[in-house]
Structures are given as structure tokens and as C-alpha cells.
């Protein structure tokens, strides 16, 4: 996954992958609300393995920005791009590229609530770190104003954890693993001697999804 930002993503965001791509006939559905390729039967809801499955993200972004999706499947001879102007042939490798320009230009009142470019960039990098921890088998690269900001190659889980966490964490942590009925827990915890005053490097994941939970945070804090 490669992400390119301009002015903290306010001016332009490009997210590209080398996945399976979206067939031409399905591209219009990508921007429709409540349309998704992640769910095909009701039973799929019982074991969701993807980050998104409600079909709302792209439609929501398309309603407040200029969005272009370019995609190509392995079977297709060429890529296709969809935007407000319709669907046209395009150059592109296998996978999907989503370009978002002029965020909130359709809703100026909401645009003024955006923070500075530096702050918005920091928020995006933090989100990428969370996704990277959840999917260590995926390579992530982030470029900010054409300069490399983050590069995490596909790697084993432990190496990904140490790449995202502060440098001192590797020598000041212990692996954690436990089992209970219907539950398997694993992770890494820092030693009390390396405790931080802030909880900005606490990450909790349930079935591969990042969550914020005050009960878990309180349990960890109480243990220390």
C-alpha cells in the first residue's frame, strides 16, 4: 500500500495497492452508499476479515471531495477510471488507485475544522501505524509532499511491532500470550521501568481491528 499526501491530505491524497483490482462493471458500485464487495452472504457478517464492509467510506469521501478511482484486475487488458465525469479507459497496473483532491471543497464550512497540514499528516501517519500493526504481511509506504515519511516492509509480526514502537521498546518489553475459552491473547508489553506518561503507544486489536477501550486501558494502567 502506497500513500501520497499533499498539504496533509487536504489538497491531495493518493492511496494505491497491488491487490486484485475492481472489475469495470463494479466500479460504479464502489462509490455507491451501502454497496460493498466485502460481503456476499449474510453469514459473511459473522467472520468479517476486512477493514471495511459497510460500503460507506468511499461514498462519504466522494460526497465532500473530488474522487477518482483507477483499477485493473489481473484478467483485464487495461485499467478503468471512474470519477464524476464517468468511466474511461486509463493506464494502470493491477490493483486499485484512489485519488482524493480538494477535501471538503464541496462543504467549505467543514473544511475550516481541519487542523494544520502538519497535524493532519500526523493523524494519517498514526492511522497507518495502526493498520500496519494489524497487517504485518502488507508493505506500507507514505510520502508527504513527495518526500518519504514512512516505509514499513512486509515483515514478521514481532519485527513490525519493533519498527512501529519507540526504539527502546525492543529491549524493554516482554511477549505476552494467554488462552481462555473462546479467546486467544497475544502481544508485547513494556517493562514497568520503561513506562511512559502518555498512552499514545498503547494499541489494542480485536480480530485484527484496532479498538479503543477504556476498560482495557484501565486494566493495563492498574496492572502497572
Which ranges hold each PLM region?
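N-terminal phosphate-binding caps/lids of nucleotide- and nucleic-acid-binding domains
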Residues: 1-224
Amino acid at each position: 500500500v502506497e500513500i501520497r499526501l499533499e498539504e496533509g491530505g487536504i489538497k491531495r491524497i493518493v492511496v494505491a495497492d497491488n491487490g486484485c483490482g475492481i472489475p469495470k462493471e463494479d466500479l460504479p458500485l464502489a462509490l455507491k452508499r451501502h454497496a460493498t464487495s466485502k460481503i456476499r452472504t449474510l453469514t459473511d457478517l459473522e467472520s468479517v476479515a476486512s477493514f471495511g464492509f459497510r460500503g460507506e467510506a468511499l461514498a462519504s469521501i466522494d460526497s465532500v471531495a473530488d474522487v477518482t478511482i483507477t483499477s485493473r484486475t489481473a484478467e483485464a487488458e487495461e485499467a478503468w477510471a471512474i470519477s464524476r465525469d464517468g468511466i474511461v479507459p486509463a493506464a494502470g497496473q493491477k490493483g486499485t488507485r484512489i485519488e482524493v483532491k480538494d477535501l471538503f471543497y464541496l462543504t467549505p464550512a467543514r473544511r475550516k475544522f481541519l487542523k494544520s497540514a502538519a497535524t493532519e499528516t500526523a493523524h494519517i501517519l498514526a492511522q497507518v501505524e495502526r493498520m500496519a500493526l494489524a497487517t504485518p504481511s502488507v508493505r506500507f509506504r507514505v510520502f508527504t509532499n513527495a518526500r518519504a515519511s514512512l516505509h514499513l516492509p512486509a515483515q514478521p509480526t514481532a519485527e513490525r511491532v519493533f519498527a512501529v514502537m519507540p526504539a527502546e521498546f525492543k529491549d524493554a518489553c516482554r511477549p505476552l500470550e494467554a488462552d481462555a475459552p473462546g479467546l486467544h491473547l497475544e502481544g508485547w508489553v513494556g517493562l514497568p521501568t520503561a513506562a511512559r506518561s502518555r498512552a499514545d503507544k498503547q494499541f489494542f486489536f480485536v480480530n485484527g481491528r484496532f479498538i479503543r477501550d477504556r476498560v482495557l486501558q484501565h486494566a493495563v494502567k492498574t496492572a502497572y
